[in-house]
Amino acid sequence: MFDHNKLNFTVSKHLMFNVDGTPVDPAIGMLLKRTDTQQPLSVVSEGYEPVQYGDIVNQVEVGLQESGIDMTDATFDTKVFHNGEQLELRAKFPAHQQAMGRFTDKVVPQFVFRTSHNKTWGNNGMVGLWRSMCWNTLVSGHKLAYTYGRHTKGFSVPVFAAKVKNAAEFISGEGMTQMNEWYNTMVDRDTIY
């Protein structure tokens, strides 16, 4: 699935030190560093709890596997930027592609997610069928599940993984048939209450 070799590191908080060697009060900030290279990634608050990239990916993968989504010819793209400061994940599931409504082009279900350890990207992810999307969670299509928020405030990896699983179950089950029926149901002013 996703490339775990690119995620083979963890991060942890460390005290910062002034030029004269005295420690900086942790209430002012702490240094977030990779544990393998000791490379600094960001200054974070004392109460900040780092979320490891590997934990996110592992739980999302379990959710996808348990959903029953057809992984035939699925593509998984794992991008890590700036030595681990940022992560972007993308997956496409062509076995479930659909032609929606009057359109004849095929729309492929997708999963996208990005986050960062350097505060540039919040936790931002979506599952659905769309022709185009932006990271403000706007899509030209259908977003079946999403998360959007600050890095760790209110972000729960298990809750997000469950949303991904539910959306994938919808895609792999009767959901797509229902969605096509909705698209093909003609309505007019007289039939709308």
Please identify what each model-predicted range represents.
Residues 65-193:
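Intrinsic disorder/low-complexity polar-acidic segments
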